[in-house]
């Protein structure tokens, strides 16, 4: 816990050390993510600009926004896990169909049994485990807890911008 507090204070000191009269936040999360990726690409002399696709990253970030803020997630506990019906309309339903199955693969790679079923306006996600402690965790995490699992997101965004990966 102390390390976390120190990390936060260090980050605040770093921001203050840059300049107390200049803003440091970009004003919008997707904008800031794209800005950070572009800065990384510009700093890398090996960036192949003929493959860079910032538009694909932007579309993915819009999908993330749709799934996070607009998707409806109806969660039902099962004896061995959870079943979640994730639905939306229009762009939200499309984003759900792109993102949820991809994340089910990530969950399976983490040792849970995750499956999806396509629905007309979304996806049904079922995540189960034979381990009672994991079942408790699955029920606590719920839909968004599953979506944020793993540390692949930032690397995935950089790969997407480089034209190396898409959902």
Set out the residue ranges of the language-model regions.
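Intrinsically disordered, low-complexity terminal tails/loops enriched in metal-binding residues
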Residues: 1-167
């Amino acid at each position: 816990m102390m390390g976390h507090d120190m990390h936060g204070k260090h980050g605040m000191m770093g921001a203050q050390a840059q300049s107390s009269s200049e803003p440091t936040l970009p004003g919008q999360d997707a904008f800031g993510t794209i800005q950070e990726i572009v800065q990384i690409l510009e700093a890398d002399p090996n960036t192949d600009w003929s493959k860079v696709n910032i538009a694909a990253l932007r579309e993915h970030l819009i999908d993330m926004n749709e799934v996070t803020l607009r998707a409806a997630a109806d969660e039902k506990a099962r004896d061995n896990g959870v079943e979640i019906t994730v639905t939306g309309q229009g762009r939200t339903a499309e984003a759900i169909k792109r993102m949820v199955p991809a994340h089910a693969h990530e969950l399976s790679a983490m040792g849970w049994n995750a499956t999806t079923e396509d629905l007309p306006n979304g996806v049904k996600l079922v995540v189960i485990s034979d381990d009672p402690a994991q079942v408790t965790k699955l029920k606590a995490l719920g839909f968004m807890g599953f979506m944020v699992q793993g540390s692949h997101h930032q690397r995935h965004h950089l790969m997407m911008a480089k034209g190396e990966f898409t959902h």
